[in-house]
Amino acid sequence: GDVYKRQMLYQAKVYGETFCYYKDYSRGHQIPSADRTATDELNSQTFYASNMTPQNGDFNGGIWASLEGKIRENMCQDTLYVVTGCYFGNGYTTTYDGYYGNNADPASKICPVPTHYFKVVLRTRSGNSGKAVGQCGSDELKAIGFWLEHRNDYPQTFSTEYCKSVEYIEQQTGFTFFPSVPKEVKKQCTPSDWVL
């Protein structure tokens, strides 16, 4: 419908039709394609430029993909809330070249590269309470965050050393996640509560 038309117009105006990000960057999905497989239409929406950021290729296909898989292992009958984002700290860089191999790309744009990526995750402890988050007490909820510096030298598989509290990620980013959830839930950082 109209929302998709607006997205495509926005995409053409702002992003241009580039061959790729400069050098070793890939188009890193923020909502993974593998998380939206119910219909072809839902899956195709993950390929909008507004759902992508320039990610180092080894980061995107390595530790980040591993983390995405770990989060999928925590799906349950109740809703699993996942918020993904990127952060631009001091010293972020940009990509710009205008060339892909020997091919000039006249529509290329300058693109800022994030310094960090994060995810914050929330769900019921039981996974099958049948309750909305707002109906749950603090003892019925669990939350965790993940904060990774954007670089290429991580091991290929995810490690719990990158786990943080949602509160920590709020402090880093200045965002407020899950505003109706009690603070004690957002202070949690207990990897053993999760399939990681």
Go through each PLM region and give its residues.
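Short, small-residue-biased leader/transition segments that mark boundaries at the very start
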Residues: 1-4
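Domain-level detector of nuclease and nuclease-like folds
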Residues: 8-196
